[in-house]
Amino acid sequence: MGGFIVCLNGRFFYRFFAGKIRVDKGISQGFFADSYVVKQSSCYGKKLLDAIRDPKQPVTMEDLDHAVYYYLDTLDRFGILDEKQRIPGPIGDTVKMQSAEVARRLAGKGAVLLKNEDDILPVDFSGKKVAVIGPGGYKQVMPTFKESPYGFEDRKNSVYRLLREQYGENITFSIGDDLDGMVIPSDHLYPSCDSTEHGLKRYVGRFTYETLSNGDLDVVPRTETFVVDKEINFSGENALPALKREQRRGFFKETPKEYYMWHGFLCSNETGMHRISLQSRFPGVEAFEKNHVENGDLSIATSGNLYIREAVAREYLTRAGLGIRVSANGVVNPFSEVVSCADGWNNAGGMVWLEAGKKYEIYFNHTCIYLEPLEVRLAWTTPSMTEKAMKDAVEAAKQADLALCFAWHQSVNDKMELEENQDMLIERVAAANANTVVILNNGDAVAMPWRDHVKAILEMWFSGQEGALATMDVLDGSVNPAGRLPVTFPQKLSDLAARDTLHPERYALSGRISQKDAVHPNTAVFTEGLLNGYRWFDEKDIEPMYPFGYGLSYTKFSYSGLEV
């Protein structure tokens, strides 16, 4: 605005915004939306003090007082300055239930009905055989954004459990897409390429976030002191001892931390796509309090990293999974993927192509969180396991009157396609049961190659801790899905202004800043001007999959007796 980034425009904030809209408690910037403020960090500290003392500089003590007033006032209103009025924990059941009611109502109001052929929704579940298919039908799907509220664990439920409790054996569940898999057996692991011994080398080393940014094998920390683990399956009393040295040094990516590290080779007896998963348990806030952890101690950019060299001839490892992210100021992402394991563990993994009988180099690490012992396992889902899960789901769909197929998307992503084998699963379920309803849990637009083959599509987004109840409310008609799309759903990514190949200055095609990217670091270039969102589609005459503002409902209405 006026040639300035808005969050740096003092005239706008203090003279216009605060003066005319009567903001008396300060303005909160969106988390990580202040990239240009960060770039000005060199003006703080001693340089700011020197500027205040220098009469030639336009900075005064009054300006400093103005800047810190709102921050200190907020702390004071919550009793944090004198520590006399802090809200005691844990939160009581009354407050929890009040919040739960609001969360359920909002999730239901946000539901968007994208398709409802033959008015298959709402459903009278009485007497119907229903097959619930997909991990999202059994587990609450949660987002992985940096400020995602994960809610109370004891409030989370699933559509399958709710239906089963009410309608009994008529309701069945099939995973369809097996993300958990099984712990990789020792006879598929080798400490070195030419070894006949089974297992992986485990050692303790110092690791930074950038250590394997390029997957360069030469920078993997080496040590002569190691043990060979037959399987990587540590939990409960078998958990690995806590690593406490180096864990209290502040949040710096460049500061090495102590990690447990595993290195060796993986060999499958099947050819095809395998899901390799680094699974670990998040200790929870109880450990945070028990071990007297301070915000300044939360120094883990990522708790675990899983790398594999997919092709024997390839020079670099590629990252298949990223663990829990923990940083300072209480920011914790306990889940790195939107669907956790059945037992609640984080499930960081990815799909890789393996050929039977070939050995693939694998490296992964994990550090301790909140100074607790490490519970971790290395698992996989082989092609035969994937096929069995899909066949079981198809068979369940054949035996049912209605198939509820839950799908998820790892938003925000560089692609619109559903992850893993979900598109294939939906296609096969829809072919087996003409009455297939797809329920989506995602945060952005997704491709729907199966759109014409299913009866209904219900967009439930990431609906929070009460999401299962809210989804049930919409499915059985207790709530009318009155939500409308807040964004345009394109047919393909290149339809979006940000991904238009004619304008490479807008987006880093590699997904990260590099010398090959046209976009400068921390910069978004809106060369389309005001033609953003739906205006871009109108201007370019692009037919979207679903337009901005789209949404059906259960209400029936008509116009009659019209006169001009």
Feature names for model-found ranges:
Residues A18-F32, Y69-R77:
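Conserved short secondary-structure transition element at the edge of the structured enzyme core
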Residues K84-S99:
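Flexible, acidic loop-helix segments that line cofactor/substrate-binding pockets
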Residues D65, Y69, M97-R104:
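An alpha-helix initiation/capping motif
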Residues M1-I21, K25, C43, L49-P55, ...:
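C-terminal non-catalytic regions of proteins with extracellular/luminal or membrane-system context
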Residues G3, I27, S35, V59, ...:
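Short aromatic/hydrophobic-glycine micro-motifs
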